[in-house]
Amino acid sequence: MVNRINPKAIKAGGTLNLFEKYLTLWVALCIVIGIALGKLLPAVAQTLDSWSIYNVSIPIAICLFFMMYPIMVKIDFSQARQAVKAPKPVILTLVVNWVIKPFTMVIFAQFFLGYLFAPLLTATEIIRGQEVTLANSYIAGCILLGIAPCTAMVLMWGYLSYSNQGLTLVMVAVNSLAMLFLYAPLGKWLLAASNLTVPWQTIVLSVLIYVGLPLAAGIYSRYWILKHKGRQWFESQFLHYLSPIAIVALLLTLILLFAFKGELIVNNPLHIFLIAVPLFIQTNFIFLITYVLGLKLKLSYEDAAPAALIGASNHFEVAIATAVMLFGLNSGAALATVVGVLIEVPVMLMLVEICKKTAFWFPRDPEKATLLDPRCINQEIRI
């Protein structure tokens, strides 16, 4: 039996490509390559990091821009106007992402990394001239992940879970705009509460460079291309050739990061697992909260599933970029954000399957979905 595409629904998302499907494998390869680079050519990473302006590494900034821009150019911000037509799921995702999720991430990170696993994380590192324990540095990375709701791969999660992709696009647009204004103040406040001093100007500059600049470039170039080249050329040609650039930029950033952190990982492979514990629990906890709230609000499954999935997943590109700028490429905070990348795909695919298996809990409105649920299609139109 083959799933049927709904011709009436908004086309967004799709099946995972080779990179996205095996993201965990590529990150693991980057760990190996980065560690080898750090061991064999230790001067390379230091030289690259020395090319900086106001503590912003130019090579890394370039990589991070090309990692972020393809994500931003894919977002249709005109969909944000549609939020008034579906207020309940949009309000739900905003409340979860910006009122609940940041604080539960702090609680889980502090409990596991700052208390339970603290005896295993007693080493320190120097960040901006300040001696910081690895535990606190890892907590900072977790916080930066926790306040960055996913706006990219969630389209794929929504598609695979038979969700309302029109609503998913609305939530992506609204959360991206919210991130531009809320990420810096929330990050500053929560990091300060975790005994990590971050200059206000630095985190604002980080958001402007790694969110604002790609966002502005994405909005303008999307508008210009759609106006002069048309949607078909934009989707079939421009995005087709742009996606590999984002992949290469992400992989280069990860290789450089692990070139710095190679020795720590070789000596303490347990750290990767320890960081993954609060991230895994946070992802599942937020998913459960949002999913249950969607049930209580009497949302249809097609609206509740993407709301839960966008809350559960993280915008790891923004988190990596911010951690690198605030704490440095060789910081524990940057390493913690990469652990988020490492577990993202397998955990989210697990949650997609949970959504599909529990869809019967909710009222169904299958015609909203781009990929129709075969369980909701009449036998005669199954292919």
UniProtKB/Swiss-Prot annotation:
Localization per record: Cell membrane
Please report a single Pfam family linked to this protein: SBF
Residues spanning the membrane: 25-45, 53-73, 103-123, 139-159, 166-186, 200-220, 238-258, 272-292, 309-329, 332-352
Membrane disposition: Multi-pass membrane protein
Q: Which InterPro entries match?
A: Arsenical-R_Acr3, BilAc:Na_symport/Acr3, Na+/solute_symporter_sf
**Which Gene3D superfamilies does the record associate with it?**
1.20.1530.20
Q: Which UniProt keywords apply?
A: Cell membrane, Membrane, Transmembrane, Transmembrane helix, Transport
Q: Does the keyword Lyase apply?
A: no
One molecular function GO term is: antimonite transmembrane transporter activity
Query: Biological process (GO) annotations?
Result: antimonite transmembrane transport; arsenite transport
GO CC annotation terms, alphabetical: plasma membrane
Q: What is its main location?
A: membrane
Record-stated family: Belongs to the arsenical resistance-3 (ACR3) (TC 2.A.59) family.
What the entry lists under NCBIfam families is as follows:
acr3
Question: What's the protein called, per UniProt?
Answer: Uncharacterized transporter slr0944
